Amino acid sequence: MILGIGVDLVSVKRIRSASERTGGRLLVRLFTPAERDCCRARRAAYECYAARFAAKEAVFKALGTGFSGCCWHDVEITNGPGGGPVVALTGSAARVAARRGITGVLLSLSHEGDQAVAFAIAVGPSESQRK
């Protein structure tokens, strides 16, 4: 059952300039080591960072919290065996998900030119399945 949805659109140029302005500290604050390793390994690293930032924002929206009370590292976006995005929730994001009955988050990412977009769907058992 769908328990929440979220979408976010991010400018690749904005992520690149913010990273350059902070000497890369922004990337450390926003992304886990696994996320940074994944993006650095790509030819289009900033498109990867922008898509993952959009994904984190979309996941927070799907959880129903916005960014409130969560840490950027509480949502980790990696790639599954087939290459598709996988969401891992930890810390306060995992607690919010458990409280709301969310057992997983489906995620779609895309980027074109200067834009990256993410769409997240929080899923869990229906009320009748939870009883």
Swiss-Prot record:
InterPro entries: 4-PPantetheinyl_Trfase_dom, 4-PPantetheinyl_Trfase_dom_sf, ACPS, Ppantetheine-prot_Trfase_dom. The keyword Phosphoprotein does not apply. GO terms for cellular component: cytoplasm. Its main location: cytoplasm. Its EC number is 2.7.8.7. Gene3D superfamilies: 4'-phosphopantetheinyl transferase domain. It catalyses: apo-[ACP] + CoA = holo-[ACP] + adenosine 3',5'-bisphosphate + H(+). One of its GO terms (biological process) is fatty acid biosynthetic process. It holds the Pfam family ACPS. Belongs to the P-Pant transferase superfamily. AcpS family. Transfers the 4'-phosphopantetheine moiety from coenzyme A to a Ser of acyl-carrier-protein. This is Holo-[acyl-carrier-protein] synthase.
